[in-house]
């Protein structure tokens, strides 16, 4: 695409428009600047609310993929790519899953996480290559993330995913975007022009983060990774998380800190197993088998034991 054509294309994007509420932002003192930005930020959850049905549809597809050993792959450039990497990296400690289950790909590779490599997004071939490098398959789900909805790297990835029969999801902050047109599911929270024209790390980035949070959190809940609203598959990999594990057991069972700590040590800090042992008085092996029979769903394991 020529420079003139690119300028013309960008001029039609909502995310590249000038915001009439911040035209004088360069004249304002600090408090007024951040108040203007905050006023714009308040619009983000309202935009996300309008696309909840599409988000839920994507959650169902992701959950189905996980159940057959598939993966969730995020793909984006710049801020969009970093947000995908961030959400993916939080899944292992939060939900106790493999770091291969949710993967974030960013145009330009790992170096682009810390230092912008803006030109890397211009190659659709790179998107396809990055997916092939991780053995992307039809069992996986690809979420292409691009605030503009027209990033070549993401388009290339989505097109390749379509050719092999994988489920594709487009996350954009512009209506009727190119990536929305080629994906199975289009999630398009339109947040309007940014406080600083074209700086899509602002409202657009916030909207993307909210959506990604929902995709992984809701999918993991559907897989039994929570009990009530507690993170019962959390991995106690540092002192803070060891303390959190004990607190979760105490909250779920109303036991003492001493009992929670004792049982957690027996289970090698498997929170879900510790809770089941305390609530049912089962020994560790019986509790493990009972949990396995309920596909890892702690609530089902507790209730089925009570009914016997």
Swiss-Prot record:
The active site is at 90 (proton donor), 121. Gene3D superfamilies: 1.10.8.1080, Glucose-6-phosphate isomerase like protein, domain 1. One of its GO terms (molecular function) is carbon-oxygen lyase activity. It catalyses: N-acetyl-D-muramate 6-phosphate + H2O = N-acetyl-D-glucosamine 6-phosphate + (R)-lactate. Keywords: Carbohydrate metabolism, Lyase. Transmembrane segments: none annotated. Residues 62-225 form the SIS domain. GO terms for biological process: 1,6-anhydro-N-acetyl-beta-muramic acid catabolic process; amino sugar catabolic process; N-acetylmuramic acid catabolic process; peptidoglycan turnover. Its EC number is 4.2.1.126. Pathway: Amino-sugar metabolism; 1,6-anhydro-N-acetylmuramate degradation; Amino-sugar metabolism; N-acetylmuramate degradation; Cell wall biogenesis; peptidoglycan recycling. It holds the Pfam family GKRP-like_C. A lyase-type mechanism (elimination/hydration) is suggested for the cleavage of the lactyl ether bond of MurNAc 6-phosphate, with the formation of an alpha,beta-unsaturated aldehyde intermediate with (E)-stereochemistry, followed by the syn addition of water to give product. Homodimer. Specifically catalyzes the cleavage of the D-lactyl ether substituent of MurNAc 6-phosphate, producing GlcNAc 6-phosphate and D-lactate. Together with AnmK, is also required for the utilization of anhydro-N-acetylmuramic acid (anhMurNAc) either imported from the medium or derived from its own cell wall murein, and thus plays a role in cell wall recycling. Belongs to the GCKR-like family. MurNAc-6-P etherase subfamily. This is N-acetylmuramic acid 6-phosphate etherase 1. The gene is murQ1.
